[in-house]
Amino acid sequence: MSTVVVKGNVNGGVQQPRRRRRQSLRRRANRVQPVVMVTAPGQPRRRRRRRGGNRRSRRTGVPRGRGSSETFVFTKDNLMGNSQGSFTFGPSLSDCPAFKDGILKAYHEYKITSILLQFVSEASSTSSGSIAYELDPHCKVSSLQSYVNQFQIPQGGAKTYQARMINGVEWHDSSEDQCRILWKGNGKSSDTAGSFRVTIRVALQNPK
């Protein structure tokens, strides 16, 4: 008895699964693979800053090349308990040659915008008395007339004047004084009182 093996396209035959696998492979090969484009994240756009018309005025109060702003410090030493005197701020300020004989002569106009008056005590703890001081914003007074404001000689103290108090809002000709501070002590002539330390801020314009 012989055995016959039939190879054909009979449904349910042995070759049917292989043909399906080949067809499946062909379909996969014919499929178009999608291409994914990956782009790097872009740089954030920079917003252009708008320049204001008064940018220079925000940077500095005085236009470059037309004016200047300076600070000066000077002292009045060896004050006794009964010393008296005055500071005249402007071309008459002999206690500050760097201002009077220096930069003030290089400009036509100036204005002192602040004054810091400090009394530094050098007195002993047993000393007594005080130093009265007065602001004259228009240089009309030649001697102390008010004793309301005082520095206690053993303690010292400080007083700040802003522009509106010292006639420092408007510009002044460099040949005229702006304001004056007068002072007078009521202590003993034999007692050492201390010294004044004065700081002024000055704006200048219209160079010569």
UniProtKB/Swiss-Prot annotation:
Positions with biased composition (Basic residues): 17-30, 44-61
Record has Nucleotidyltransferase as a keyword: no
Residue ranges, compositional bias (Low complexity): 1-16
Superkingdom of source: Viruses
CC annotations in GO: T=3 icosahedral viral capsid
Single GO molecular function: structural molecule activity
Keyword ATP-binding: no
Positions of region (Disordered): 1-69
Xref: Pfam families: Luteo_coat (PF00894)
Subcellular location: Virion
The entry's keywords: Capsid protein, T=3 icosahedral capsid protein, Virion
Record-linked Gene3D superfamilies: 2.60.120.20
Record text about domains: The N-terminus like those of many plant virus capsid proteins is highly basic. These regions may be involved in protein-RNA interaction.
Record's function text: Major capsid protein that self-assembles to form an icosahedral capsid with a T=3 symmetry, about 23 nm in diameter, and consisting of 180 capsid proteins monomers. Most of the 180 monomers are the major capsid protein, but a small percentage contain the minor capsid protein, which has a long C-terminal extension.
Name of the molecule in the record: Major capsid protein
